[in-house]
Structures are given as C-alpha cells and as structure tokens.
Amino acid sequence: MLKSFEHVGMTVSDMDRAIEFYCTLLGLRLHLRKTASDGSHIAFLDAGGAMLEVFAPADGAARAVDVPEGASGLRHLTFLFEDIDATFAKLEEAGVELKERPRLAINREILHKVAFVRDPDGILIELAERAD
C-alpha cells in the first residue's frame, strides 16, 4: 500500500549553488550531503513532506532544457508557499531568473496563485499558493 510521495531526483551543475537556491532562497532544509568516491556530490533536501534528491557530477552538468512540446517528461517542480508575492519579490531581489510573475492559477480548484522562476541550472520552478 502506498504511504506517500518520497522524493524526486535531479542533476545540477554545482551543489553549493543548488543548496543556496533551494535552502536559503526557497526554504528547503538540508537533510544529508555526501561526496562519492568519484568526486560527485549528492544531497537530500527536505521540502516538508517529500525530499528533493540532488546530484552534482564531479565534471559538472549542462544547463537543463525544457521538455519539448509533444514530448514526455517532467515540466516543472512545484513548491507550496503561504505568500508567493513575498517569495517572488525575495527571488527577484536575489537576481533569480524570472519566468512568470504571480497570477491567478488556471486550476483554481486546487491552487489560488502561481508564479514561475528558473533555478541556477535552468530548471523550471513553480511557486504555488492555495486559497485555504
């Protein structure tokens, strides 16, 4: 029987930069960080109910590309916030690449507002807020 969603894994080019973005700017918590014998790095970041598993190859990684129209794949990662206007302003102040400013969500049955930014490697991040 399913218990919950556990984690999603992703590759980044620079572990320190990824931890700065996800932990310092978005508020995830560093749960574990290790260096493998080949020099690559792995970290688990607690997102408050599920984890983000982050891999950083020793030789770095190329910038992420969006899933092409008509192709299968993960489109974005979504994190839930109490106030996405404040979060978006914080990210803008920090110089994060902005994709779409806060707006009312299309799927209002689930989310109230959404916004989109890119992490340091170009991965699309959705900021979401519910109207509880």
Regions inferred by a protein language model and the residue ranges of each:
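Helix N-cap motif at beta-to-alpha junctions
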Residues: D14-M15, E82-I84
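Short glycine-/small-residue motifs
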Residues: E126-L127
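Conserved beta-strand-loop-alpha-helix junction that forms the acyl-donor binding cleft
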Residues: V12-M15, A36-D38
